[in-house]
Amino acid sequence: MKNIRVIKTGIDVSKILEQIKEHPEDWGSQKNIKDKKIEQLDPTKYTVTVDVLQLIMGGIEKEGQYVGDTEICIQTPAYKKHTEVLKFLKTYFKKIRRCAFLSLPVGEIVGSHIDEGTYYLTKDRYHLSIQGKYRYSVGDETMIVEPGTFFWFNNKLPHGAENIGDEVRITFVFDAPHHKRNP
């Protein structure tokens, strides 16, 4: 496959999951950050079944600016609590940018979409599957993802997910600046 590249499978993610369970208050906590640099989704415009636990989120310089067109990255208070996933990241990358845990209920989908904006033009995007089984599609390629799978994908193509397991899917999605040594 050229649009999905599995880097490693069978990673022990139990300590990462344990920290997520220790801090349930972190899910959606970015909504409580009162900072004009942080763009909040308008609940009247978006229906969201995915829950988000952001560690580093995008920001804006001025009201009305699209977060996908800025390089601003802001650590959330949750960042310091999730040390196990940060340890994992340091084994592969010197620098990471925006990153978050995403949950998806059983049977739900994340519809096919492209990550748009100038921010994404210089980033590689990855998943580390933490819990649940899901079908992941990028362009015309599809794979089944099990917990402990670490992969890169081309987020400049349409991509989406479907939770085909029997528990909530949790995956860690993160960006790293393009680099020839990236996995």
Residue ranges and their predicted role:
Residues 161-165:
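Asparagine-centered strand-capping/turn motif at beta-strand->loop junctions
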